[in-house]
Amino acid sequence: MSNELWGRKIEVIIRNKVLTYPELYIEFETNFDTEPIPDLGEVNIYNLSDNTLAEITLGDGIIVNAGYNDDIGSIFHGVISEIETTNEGVDTVTKIKMINVTQQYLNRYINFAYGAGANTKYLIRDMLDYAGGLKPNINNPTNNITYPRGFQATGKIKDVLTRVVEESGSRWLIHGSSISVIPKETGYTQGVYLDAKSGLMSVEKLEKQDGVSTHKIEMMLNHSIAPYSLLEVHAKNLDGIVMVVKGKHKSDFTTELEVRTL
């Protein structure tokens, strides 16, 4: 179906410049897994202006957000490791390779006084945005506390966020590029219900003799999916709870996963 029908959106943020789809044609593939090695990703952006191209350099911070309508979340935070611009027919294609450095964003310092009435969800969104345009994949604290006298945010952003999250009786999880705030009493990470009506496209049993993954899943893009996410899957050849081992988000708005049954 058309972009207008689905409301597909992509944001690529480089420094303070925001490049958006569908205004620009953008392709991406971002990878994630349970290994400690930083995740990698690639973005192709078509027909950038000469001025914009001149402003993009190696080592620049880059964030990729994707989703539908108002439900947009980060699928990659990192730095640019390679840039190449080529001509393909009448188009100019800028190919950008990225490496994940979410923790560097969260180690930035903040010194800001929020006014009376600020609440937990707003503080989380605003501080992640201040960190470099980050967005929470899940922002569902146990208690959305209102601070009637305001809130003083001073220190490393990750330390201030930890305080806000703990005061709300919640927990926050960072898996690669995914940042989620969830109720403390939920499982290791919030589960996602998945069947044909909610975005499941296919399930394939894997025959790996020495691997931890048992099944491969293809689904509509869901920016909240990350390593260790729990999925409640209902399909003909898989019915039950699985844990995400690795996967990728793609610009055809699919998420491909390898999972293991629990």
Question: Where in the sequence are the language-model features?
Answer:
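Surface-exposed cap/loop segments at beta↔alpha junctions
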Residues: 48-132
